[in-house]
Amino acid sequence: MNENYKNLVQDLVDDLKAVFTHAGLGGEAGEYKLLTQSFLYKFLNDKFLYEAKAVDTKNIYEELVKMSLDDYRWLLEDIGTATAQLKPEQFIETLHRKQNEDNFYEVFETTLNQIAIDNNDIFSVHTDGDTAIRLFDERLITDNISDSSKRNQVARAIINLLARVKFDETIFSQGFDFFSTLFEYMIKD
């Protein structure tokens, strides 16, 4: 089973790299940042959905977006620190539905930025000098895609790829190591 997941991760990496290469980032540091942070977003999104469903099997995307604010707060309490906490408007599927908005890349960046802010106390890493390193760069697309005419295209391609790939419950329950697979594959490339 892990071989299937390994191939799924590698295919997603290849598809994302193709997007970034087409945007002029082949082999650059910006490609690495976009790739790892896109992948992190995918992981956190699917892990959150997995944890929500572990609380109650009825907690699928369609039900989560309809939940009252109070019920959603209770769900977040139940999930605790098992994963980063996301709001329904931050789910990949929600962003996927917004991809035709003007300046979608800004919607994408704002979403990742808010996830980083909301989870900063628990999920940021600190340097020796006690500087917090956030989950996501504040201007991930803007700072890495110099050609402003390509920013929406890149953000849309990312969200389409992330929405297409589904990491199911089995991948989380078996403890598949996403990031070792990701980084080993990137090093070989």
Which sequence ranges carry the predicted segments?
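Non-catalytic, mostly N-terminal accessory regions of nucleic-acid modification and defense proteins
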Residues: M1-D189
